[in-house]
Amino acid sequence: YVFNNTEHAANLFGLRELGNIYTRLMNPTTDVLEQRVAALEGGAAGLGVASGTSGVFYSIINLAQEGDEIVSANNLYGGTYTQFNDILPKFGINVKFVDPNDPQNYAAAITDKTKALFCESVSNPGLDVADLEAIAKVASDHGIPLIVDSTFSTPYLTNPIEHGASIVVHSLTKWLGGHGNGIGGVVIDSGTFDWKNGNFPLYDEPDNSYHGLRWGHDLPEPLAPVAFILRMRTVPLRNLGACISPDNSWQFLQGIETLPLRMDRHCENALAV
């Protein structure tokens, strides 16, 4: 948390360069965690948050606003289903639920108000496996991102970005952490989605909450690919505050060290059963 001079400080706050400015937004320990999970997922950037549930919520409100729609699989973790079915509508965001076993169900539910598709790579608790490539193609054909909660498969077993997902969410509390000693979540940005395609007013119009910045247009070229994560960091996270404890970030970094050993054993046990 060093400002070399006033120009350096202005550049940090103006997002002309990256650095630690305030621990709710950026923390050195959490930064290591974000980079490590992003590397495991093959993503461009990550954002640590207080829980997987807050990661899902921030992912939605970071691209959708009142009057918009999300199309989601119906076989979701109960907390996510409640968030989508009961909470988001109070913010004016409507979620349409579809049977994900036929990816064309997503296509049939998309309208000009749809801002994203959502699914879980392996559903919680039903263990249904999503056809990520097929769902991602539907999203791509309509110029919208696919958001995947990949908590149950972890990056050791599945990399949704390789199959076309734009955003990946994890509850770190479960298999990535592995030891039940912390609560947290992380959102990974693939860095490949075009937020300037005309479908996202939140990225085209000036943001009054951040000096009139247009997230899809005004970032310097090195930062433009991770506009989604930068906006999530400086709008929802900064202003709503569901930040991860740096101590929990450290605990998750220790847990990730044993992820391959634990996932191999989980798979061996499952095959035996």
Residue ranges with predicted function:
Residues 3-54, 79-87:
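Conserved N-terminal alpha-helix of the aminotransferase class I/II PLP-enzyme fold
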Residues 1-2, 255:
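Structured loops at beta-to-helix junctions and adjacent beta-edge loops in soluble globular domains
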Residues 45-273:
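Conserved PLP-enzyme active-site core in the AAT-like
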